[in-house]
Amino acid sequence: MTLQEFYARVGGDYSATHSRRPSEALIKKFVLKYPGDPSFEQLRAALDAQDWELAFRASHTLKGVAQNLGMDRLYKAAAALCDAVRGPKPLEDASLWPPVLAAHEEVLAAVREL
């Protein structure tokens, strides 16, 4: 799979990412590191524990990682959840979690094919 195909699959913007980081090798290097980023698992654990401060921090970090890597679908899902727990305050809309989970799993599956 090419990086362009990867970005199409995960709902990302390869052109915008490439304009910020002109080296395709560098983009691929950082994309391949995504599975090792702890923010998603920290977010999952925080939501399970109803630790809203940690949920905010983890979702904010995940949002930033996704945005920096041009993974727009994951970024938008994480941003919506981040805004919901900002304060920090309890997550009142549980429907915000499944899009984050789905986008994360989609990225992981696509990374395995790079």
What are these model-predicted stretches?
Residues 1-57, 61-114:
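Two-component system phosphorelay core
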